[in-house]
Regions:
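DPxDG-like acidic metal-binding loop motif
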Residues: 1-28
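Oxyanion-binding and handling regions
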Residues: 27, 31-151
Length: 151
């Protein structure tokens, strides 16, 4: 989902600390894939696209067909029409989205629905390895990140 790099790092540090303290595994899953399988399980045509806002001018796209993920990629908003399937859904992650995404039917996936999808399709979750110790971004990494951040 959306969030700052700092927020992601804080969450990662908190989860890693709890996992080490309690010797518990931490699982990861892809929210786009969970959304796709949720739409599929709700019934109807199994040929559709899931979209989610990404950085400014871009969206994440997942195409789903025949009960499988066809592709998942980040794409420029202006090119969405050529890559999306006719039936498409917007995974609601932000209150405001670009004009190209604002016309798409929104879907929300609850925690209980996420749990049910993961029970039904356990291969969508994987156990995370412990991350390496945190370190500061190099100047080059920082410049690369800052160039992508909306100012």
């Amino acid at each position: 989902g959306p969030g700052s790099v700092l927020g992601t790092r804080v969450a990662s540090a908190a989860v890693s600390t709890l996992a080490k303290m309690h010797k518990a595994p931490v699982f990861e899953f892809d929210a786009m894939k969970i959304a796709a399988y949720a739409v599929f399980c709700r019934g109807g045509n199994s040929d559709f696209s899931i979209l989610a806002p990404s950085r400014k001018g871009f969206a994440n796209l997942l195409n789903f067909s025949n009960a499988e993920v066809e592709c998942e990629r980040e794409i420029e908003d202006e090119n969405l029409a050529s890559f999306c399937k006719p039936r498409k859904f917007l995974l609601k992650q932000k209150n405001t989205v670009s004009k190209n995404l604002s016309e798409i039917e929104e879907i929300e996936i609850s925690l209980s629905e996420t749990y049910e999808i993961l029970k039904r399709y356990p291969n969508l979750a994987t156990i995370c390895g412990f991350p390496p110790d945190a370190k500061s971004l190099t100047k080059r990494e920082y410049v690369k990140w800052k160039a992508q951040a909306p100012i």
